């Protein structure tokens, strides 16, 4: 933890600086950040898995304890109100004793409904940040998730501190071990369900601890972009494997995708071509580049692949202009990554939250920012055989440019996606995923 502890001091200083600046602009006394509360299932006595408010875990790695609060004003030592009830039914979180605790004035809260006793007396001039607006109202907050504060914090969250970058490297390092285990399980005949167990065991995290529901897709299931079902039986014929899975470290996420062919064939060659294209796109990343331009460059590469692999006829630019590439590559190239998998700030032009919309022809693009140092983004081009989208091409003249025989041959394989997590530096790109061991 020495390196994290070293970086953490500067991380807290930067968060305090941001808070002080926005409080001065908005004439607020401070921010009260709520970790969140348990959500109970309807007509039940069981709670949904708890997920901490990302604004809360930006300050400290308390991820699994509801009813905690942070009181920050950018000047004084931040106060952590740590929930530690007297409870013989459930495990009670230990009093924190890690490198980060020296930066907080820690108060223990034994009853969640007594938190008002720990909050500032002039609460009306403090802003509440969190999900539970009804609780905030009862406590007397008149400013609840104010737009100006949220926009400012979201814009700056895209610029990661050295502490955050190190957490994300470790999240990648953990996920890489899971991907290697999953790949091995695939080639040894495991089912989707069994591959999932191999992955979770390798990363040492439960389904509730990884940052999102893993996509473990064999064969044609790989054509379902957000496939989260897990078949318990192995397919009669093993063709392909797409895995989109990450890991968490101190609240920060990794988000990695790989695709494998079971045998050497045309689909395997298509994976090789996509891998080459993805690395070329990453080489294009640098400060000052518009992320939508990278997305458009991806469509140009997908168009060339459609031609090279006899999936379509015509010229590459025409395939893009007619929307044919969008039927094979319907999602965005990638997104901001950090405390959340689809991290905030991807559409923010400035601190005021001016929104830069995705291009009309590419509505699913999740980032329209100009790249800058210390941003972390995913790069995840893909190519899929999705019948619902391809059927739209059949309805007009575009269908005449598709080689439906090749489509039929590739349909059982589902699709391809290759995704790395990349830090933009001033003079280079750091592909965390590959540099930490997932080279193919």
Swiss-Prot record:
The keyword Manganese applies. GO terms for molecular function: aminopeptidase activity; metal ion binding; metalloexopeptidase activity; phosphoric triester hydrolase activity; proline dipeptidase activity. Its cofactor is Mn(2+). InterPro entries: Creatin/AminoP/Spt16_N (IPR029149), Creatinase/aminopeptidase-like (IPR036005), PepQ_N (IPR048819), Pept_M24 (IPR000994), Peptidase_M24B_aminopep-P_CS (IPR001131), X-Pro_dipept-like (IPR052433), X_Pro_dipept (IPR022846). The keyword Manganese applies. Its EC number is 3.4.13.9. It catalyses: Xaa-L-Pro dipeptide + H2O = an L-alpha-amino acid + L-proline. This is Xaa-Pro dipeptidase. NCBIfam families: PRK13607.1 (NF010133). Binds 2 manganese ions per subunit. Mn(2+) 1 binds at residues 255, 335, 380, 419. The gene is pepQ. Splits dipeptides with a prolyl residue in the C-terminal position. One of its GO terms (cellular component) is cytosol.
